[in-house]
Every structure is written in C-alpha cells, then in structure tokens.
C-alpha cells in the first residue's frame, strides 16, 4: 500500500497541516508538509490521541465511597444533652496505570539514571583531562626553563661586560614570571582536584541508592508479601485511618466539652473512650493449614441413604463416592438410593468408621408398647385349617358340606376366586377354615394361606389323582413346616382309585400311615358326606398334638387374609386374629395403612363388637386398602400409628425406587437391543386384592418378545370415570373382574369408544387376552410353489421378445404369477409371467402335462432346458 503524505492525510481527516504536524511532533514524530506517513506512524499517532482523550490506554479509575455514621452528644436547653447522628461521607478515586505507562515511566527513570551516570563519567573524564593538561604544561614549562637557562648561560659567556643593574632587572623579571606560572599551575591543580572529588561523591551517592533499591527488591521477593496491594487490606487500612481521624476529632470535641462542663463529664468521656477503643488490627496471615493426616469420621448410616447424603456425612464430594463405587464394580448416580450394607462398605473402604442406626425406632417403640407381657395367661385356641388342592377337586364343596351352607353356588363358575375364611362349631370344638383358590394363577394366595395356618388339608380327587396344583400345595405345606392331612374326595364315584392316589402322593414325599408314613389320610365324599366326621376328628386330634395356645386378653394381633375397596364402605380388610381380642374402636396399624375400627363383621355379614384368637373378621375404618399378608397390630396412640404408617410408606417408596433404578441399570443393554415391541395396554380393576395380584401375574406372564402386556393401571373397586379416561388416552382395554362401571364411567366409555370387558372367571380373561395378543403378532408369509414348466423351444415375437415353448411338468401355471427362471437348478432370474398362451389363445392357467407358450416380463435370455418355476405367497396364521 502506498504511503500518504502529511498534506493528504490532513485533507482526509479534516485538519490543517500545521495542526497535524504539531500533533505528530507531540507524538514524538517529526514530519514536514511533504513527508510521507507510514501505517506504523499513523498507528502511533492514533494511540497518542486515544491516550490524550481517555481512550483504551487511558488509566483505569475506581471510585470508592465510604459512609460513616456516628453519634455526637450535644448539650441542649435545660442542661440536658441530646444525641445527634453525624454522617461522614468520603469519596476516594484510585487510578490504575496501564502497563504501557508503567513501562514508559520505568524507561524514563532508567534514562535519567543513565544520563546521571554519563554526566558523572564525563565530569571524571574532564577532571582527568585537566590534570593531564596541567602535567603537560608543567613539563613544557620545565623544558622551556632548561632551554632558557642554557641560553642565558650562553649569553653570559657572550656578554660578560653586562652591568649589575641590568642583571638585577633581568632576574626580577624572571622571578615574577616564575611566580605567575606557579600561581596558574596551583589554580589548575585545585580545579582538577575539585572536579575529581565531585565525580567521586556523585558516583558514591548513586551506588548507595542502587544498592539500597536492590536490597529492598530482594527482601520483598523473599517475603512474598503480595497482600499489601490487595483491595481488602487497602480498604481495611482506609477504614482504620477514617476511624482514627474521626476519633481524633471526637476526642478534641469531648475535651472541649469536658472543660466546659467539669469533672464528671470528663471522666465519663474518658470511660467511653476506653470502651470504644478499637482492637488491634488482625493479622494478614491466613490461619488455614492443609491437613497432613487422613481424617476419620464416625458416619451414621440409616437403612437407606442417597449418594449425595453419604457424601455430606463423610465431608467429601459426591464424585469421590461415585468413583469409589465404580472401582467396586457398581454404576450409580448422585441421587441414587443405597442400602445400608452398600453404604457401609463404601464408607469403610474410604477409611471412615460406620455407626449403623435404626430409623424404625418409633415403630419398634409403638409395637413394644402393648399388653402382651410374658406373665399373661395363655389359653387353648381353635386350629386354623387351610384347604388346598387342584382346581375342581372339591375343596369348596367339602367346606360347604362342613358348614352346611351353599358357598360353592355363589362362586362364579363354581371356582373359588379369593380366600374364604370361616369358623365352624363342631361337637368336639371350633375349627377355622381358609379356603384357597386352586387355579394356577393364585400361587401367592396359597402361599399366604399356608403361612397363616396351623394345619393343611390337601384335597385330592380320587378319580383324578395328583395334579400340578396338588404338588404345589405339598411344597407350600413343607416350606411352612405345617402338618399335612390328605382328604381323598369324590369317593362316591365308581372311578375312584385309592391306591393310585397313595402311590402318586408317595412320589412327592406324602406317605400314608398305612404305608408307614406320618400323614393322615381321610376318604371323604363332599356329595354324600361320607368320612367328613372322621376328617374333623383327625383335624382336632392333630390340633391337640400341636398344643395350640394364644393370649385371649390383651391387644390383638393378626394377619390380613384379604382386602378390597367397597364403594359404600371404603377400604375393607379381612383379618385373621392370631392373639388377643380385637374390639370395635381399637387403633389398628396394618402394613402401610392405619385407622380406627368403625365396624366389625363376621363371615356371615353379622355385626360383632369383638373377636378372639383364630376368628376371621372384616374390619372397616382403615386409611387405605392394605396388601394381603400384611400384619395387623393394635396400638395405643393413633398419632404414633399414623407416623409409623407414613414412615413405612416412605421406606417402601425408597426401596421400590432403588429396585427400579437397579433394574434400569442392569437391563440397559437389553433395552438397547430390544426391537420394536408391540404393547397391549390394559387397565385392570378387580373386586379383591388377591385376585388382582393373581390376574396381574398371569397377564404379565403372557408377554413375549414381540407382544408385551402392559398393565398401565390396576386397582380394587368399581370402574370409575378416571379409569375410562385413562384407558381412552392410553388406547387400552378396560377390564373389570367381578366389578362394574358406574354411570359416569359408562358415559365416558360410550363417548370415547373404549373397549370394555367384564369377566367373572379368570380362565376366560386369560384366554381372550391371549387371543388379542395373537391378533397383534406380525403376519408370517411363506412362498409356495404351484407349478413347474420345462422350456422345450424358444421363439421370437416382435411384441413380446423371446417366447418359451414349455411343457408343464408339475402343478399349474397361472398368468401374472411371480416366477423364477432356473438354469441347472440355479435361480438366474426372478420376475413376473407376462404372457401365457396355448395354441395362440391367451389362457389364465395351464395344467400339468400340457404345452404352452410363456413370455417372461423384461427378460429375453431364455434357453432350451431352462425351468420356469411359478409360486405364490401364502400368509400363515401365527399363535403364541
């Protein structure tokens, strides 16, 4: 880029040439009117102008405002003093010089010092030069004197006849001349000595100052006291200075007032001054030292703790715990819930002491505060007998005959859908029966029945023998270590085979007493009543052997057999009392729920006020529907019962969340590799909790890799409008098991066209859901060969190209069907049959053994000996 002259630049910027030259001169650049200006000189001038007008390089300013409020006592009218608030405001501006300015300043100082050194050196050199000149002059003078003496001697020789007066005048002149020369030399020597001394003093002064500055710099670097320039200390020093100044002014005012008022006020002023005396300023050195040893803490860990909470307890970052758990082979997040054992392992691995605490201390105290001391007398109680067996083997019919009541007719399809609890008075004593379902879906309900029972009666049909649920009942009885009595039912049938039943049971470890075993066998008929009395006697005999006893007086405890949500009565729970006496008005803590018993009913629906051990009873008044199998306990304080229930709910939620999180992490790769899976959404409502669990397990078990049953909502009670809305939004099937939809729900179902299904037998529900899943399966297609033709000759057609003259060897050849051309039994082309003729006539199909002409669409390379294979795609129905 060409350089610009000063005159041209002045025209561009709109200034006079003289003003621009002046600004160049101020910026340190000497220019004339016709001189060229480079880009670097332009930038230098621009930087100078910016600095002059407060631009980028202008010094940075910071203004601090300080406001101090103090109180001044002023004498008022009547000799009373009053306090006056005095506010002092100060503004200070600090200027921060930029690096360029500091550099320039340092350069100027260095330049001044260099000039001083040069000046001292020049003076020393001048003094040395003066001295050398004086010495040279003295030497020249001596030489001149020697020459003069020699000349004088010669003159004496020549002029011997000179008069004495002339000689005296000559000597006087020589003496004056010598004195003058000596004075001049002495003056020169004094000046040279003075200059040398001045140079020496100046050099000593500069060397001392330089040495002192170097010593201060080294000392500052050694101490490293960089805090002196920090704003915090500067503000503290400024505040201290302001306070000192204010106190000096206040002291002066107090002294003047004390002189005016007298002794007491003066003393008060001195005391006040002593109280207000400021403390010594704190040290600027920090007081924190890095710990050199590992810190071991006592970490108190509850039953569950999150990663962030554990990090807070150990005073470390959560990332440290996550790293430690990754080293231990576990992937966690900061909000993940850890169980007590895992948290203990992590804390001990990181060097801390662990103190395990029980968060359920309140629960322990509430359950301990009961009237069940060891000194209370225990009395004999009735045995709790659970009737088990395969479906349709006659369990409910047998119980029906014993109770003399028609229970089986009330069950849908004659199949027991949930546990029935009944107590029966016999001539020899009372027996409580639990009738469990025999269907495969009710495994959990049978397990609960075996857990709460004393004796298991295994019903086996004499004509059917041992079945899958029979084997399962045997396993439940053995797992619960419960005595087993076998009731061989349907003895009135001619197909009854006792030996077969005994033989099959013996294969599963159930040996009759006749065969040397320990199990009692009773051969009964629920239809005729044959052997029922012997069965009851055997049950009571077994109960006597067990010596069943329980506390009758005191606070009751039991187990939830069944629970449901009744529309009119609210949550209803069937409880089997195991000890104590349950009374109306008691406070019951039942699993995650609690409440005060508002009403009690027996198995026949009659209201009762109390129930003793081994008595099943329905209670009303709980806060929610408890889960079947929960322990029910009577407590004293409803408020504490509520606290325990809320604690249990929170704990249940934490455990569930931890389990879900673990499942998510473990199934991460499985979920990633899963393809597109179709889902059958279901909203399920049932009459009782046990049936709901059984149906849920059965439907979930139907899921396959292609179709998944997704129960998006389930509950106990009637179908409500909320259920219908959820089903409509989720495109789900609404299923009711022994429940119906209310009026509002029916309106929503009709308006949203929701698929609603009612069931009363679990068989039908499972079969229809399986059929629906089968319809959701992706169709499977299969290629089926319908005909095969052999090429005997090839003709050329102007319209269709190559025409193959063929003989149909197998099946039927159809027009417009997909074909394959085979050569040496290898597929070389796959396409469509375009033309099919027989004797110049277009035909739809040609059967086996006939000749025809075949035109293959978009293919002309047909040769003699090729085979043309005709096939069709057939859809195959799939099943689960």
From Swiss-Prot:
Domain of life: Bacteria
Renumbered residue ranges of the record's region G3: 435-438
Region annotated G4, chain positions: 489-492
InterPro entries named in the record: DNA-bd_dom_put_sf (IPR009061), EF-G-like_DII (IPR053905), EFTu-like_2 (IPR004161), IF2_assoc_dom_bac (IPR013575), IF2_II (IPR044145), IF2_N (IPR006847), P-loop_NTPase (IPR027417), Small_GTP-bd (IPR005225)
Region (G2), start-end ranges: 414-418
UniProt-annotated binding residues for GTP: 389-396, 435-439, 489-492
Protein name from the UniProt record: Translation initiation factor IF-2
Source organism: Shewanella baltica (strain OS155 / ATCC BAA-1091)
Encoding gene per record: infB
